[in-house]
């Protein structure tokens, strides 16, 4: 069995080695667009439950926040898992829902991944990608958008989050 897999791998490498990459100018036309800060949120961690799994420390948490995105006042509700890494960094993954506070209510569901560190002032500063999976109503323009967020969370759980958004 191992010999057969090794032979397939060798064949794949042999085929790959003969592939020629044509470097044309089409890549030069790719841009990142003009990302802008479109959202600032003021939030708070509402619940934090520490856990340890196989010696790895982390927390399950929930959060709420308020902000304005594309001129629409929204409330954010979400949850995340944060894991402490051996190098002192923090890895987070979570989901949330922005809900418009307007008469033509809309929602925008998102997921995010982040990494960060605690500063000497005790504040967690982290950043990462955010993906809007679905959106309706007056937030429908966010559907399929991706962005980068950056936030700062103090010891009391108060957070400020900024979002740069890309949409094709």
For each predicted feature, which ranges?
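Beta-strand-enriched cores of mature, soluble protein domains
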Residues: 2-168
